[in-house]
């Protein structure tokens, strides 16, 4: 009898091979249920097309007859499958894969699928799960499994058409009944299980259900390929199912599988389905509603509006909605609208006097676009976003996603405007790829669970899946998290792109509103924005040696400050108002005696000493080392101050040596406009600089060689900023 026992399985294998002689695409049909084309369904189709699967979607256009979020349901899938199988019931060679679609993707092709199906040595193979559902009382009836997952999962199964017809033949339930329970009861009936020849994919060789198995599944990269690997069983599943609460993990895996992103190829799908704006005239561009949100005291608001104006997009196709919650920024907003509001198609301002809550304002902005069918896009931008790339809006539109955000990070930090994963309670969790995405080691368009600060939404999405007028409320969540939770709940994907550097996030942690011009104090927290606002645009040319003049021996003259920097420093000093008396007695300095007194205010009097030292280190020290080769400075100073010269107050300054190794002297206003006269004369060289340029600095040696005097100011008021460096 032993030879006969050996021949039986061999005969079955020969039969199975005979059934599989045709090409995989000829004897395999994939059936799925999709009542509407969601983004999840389109992802499923894309992964299927990648491997050339034949797909037939059942139920498109039907209502889904189960309330969303309820645990029961799925009977509608059985009804649709039963009807679809009627024309295939006698096709013995036809293998049918039935699977969910919204939360499923393929990781491999038909040939591997059929090979693993045959190796299972059953006519029907169901996916297996770690958790029993929906009736835990049935646990004891399940066959014991020594290695692998024990419980049936109805989200995916494969079998020969006649066997599947037998499987669903007894279905007479309602659409709202549980398909999982229906299939479970058949499987747990030993007679039916044997008759239909059903087994489970215990070791996840074909199907990987993620619920209860998140720790088992990792990405496996290998020479331009990427798969999901089950660590527990060392298998490479063909289908990945984000069942239950694991859809976000499927989104993460779907950023890579199947071969959408690898280390060798980078992103292979980022240029699919783009909306090209090339060759489209301004008059044909889509209308964009820009929502601007100033929800807390924020540095560089004036710079924010300048960047908005620099966008390469016609204002006549842009509408503005501005919510300013802060009285502190009221003047800046009103100044911008007074100068540029008429350039936009329309403007709506909700100011601090209205006292509108953050979430309500954001709902209002989105609804303005939703209610206007001519609004093609809604572009939401918070004031703490530094949008430095003028092509930002066009680049986001071209990516052609329902919801997309550009990557924004804080300077020198991993803090960004997206999360790669969520914790069990719905808050931040770091995904495996988060750091690589933030630091640009992985570049692409990523499906993520959370975005904030800046994003573009299609108007059609706001009038469709996101039509709820209350997107920014959800339980007790903050508006940003509420928005993302509501978007996820509607099965709309949120994408993040780091294909281009469009800007960065400001740091608000140390921003103070106690000064007249608070941005001056942001050199540490937001150095790039501080540089853009306050450092002369030609400073880099000077650093390259292309814009440095030598009006007198060893005296160098180059641009350093913008007009705004000069004006704000002067205004800050006048606002402080505690000018010295210009006599020798001076309690502000060590010893209390000033040999060469001026009417001035020291940087430390306005709490600006630390920031001034940072400025010297970052911008003056590099020039010093270039202009005085061999000399290296740490930019130490005892005295840094702004001097005021007036004809009736202190018009000039007596000849003197500075108590420094070198001195910088920055002109803060304009000769011939703000004052007449003034300048500096170096006596030893009989050399004078009589027309200082606003924003330019003189740099010269201090003690010993460069004996100099301040020439008389004959009209108006002259201001200079002086530092005695390395005393």
Curated annotation (Swiss-Prot):
Cofactor(s) needed for function: Fe(2+); L-ascorbate
Gene Ontology biological process terms, A to Z: peptidyl-lysine hydroxylation
Major enzyme class: oxidoreductase
Glycosylation site list: 163, 197, 538, 686
Lineage: Eukaryota, Metazoa, Chordata, Craniata, Vertebrata
UniProtKB keywords: Dioxygenase, Endoplasmic reticulum, Glycoprotein, Iron, Membrane, Metal-binding, Oxidoreductase, Signal, Vitamin C
Residue positions binding Fe cation: 656, 658, 708
Domain (Fe2OG dioxygenase) ranges: 636-727
UniProt xrefs under SMART domains: P4Hc (SM00702)
Protein name: Procollagen-lysine,2-oxoglutarate 5-dioxygenase 1
Record-linked PROSITE patterns: FE2OG_OXY (PS51471), LYS_HYDROXYLASE (PS01325)
Function according to Swiss-Prot or TrEMBL: Part of a complex composed of PLOD1, P3H3 and P3H4 that catalyzes hydroxylation of lysine residues in collagen alpha chains and is required for normal assembly and cross-linkling of collagen fibrils. Forms hydroxylysine residues in -Xaa-Lys-Gly- sequences in collagens. These hydroxylysines serve as sites of attachment for carbohydrate units and are essential for the stability of the intermolecular collagen cross-links.
Location in or out of the cell: Rough endoplasmic reticulum membrane
